[in-house]
């Protein structure tokens, strides 16, 4: 990421204890290819306090939050992120969530393009995290029966 000018992760975030807590909480999911982890994502019902200021379309429903999606550099551009998005949507539907919320760094154009392609709507404004530089954009996918990805 940093090599592409996308410094959303740094030595302050995410720290190893963040991932350790994700594993302990049972919210970190890994994807393997040929026995090796090629990517991870965190799926949780817990949102960062910064999300409270976002004007969500599904403000009263049960939402799933996707965090910390990371793909090993050798596996970039091989469909892993799309497979994670498929998994996230199926997981949300199977478990009765009405929407999915994600955020991404303002310079992470690849992530923004993928999120938009998947039917997420960018919410107005942005959020900031104290341990990170620059704003993050928030996105939401409503999982109603009439959405374009309804299954």
Predicted regions and their residues:
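Conserved GNAT-fold acetyl-CoA-binding loop/helix
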Residues: 1-21
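Conserved beta-hairpin
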Residues: 27-43
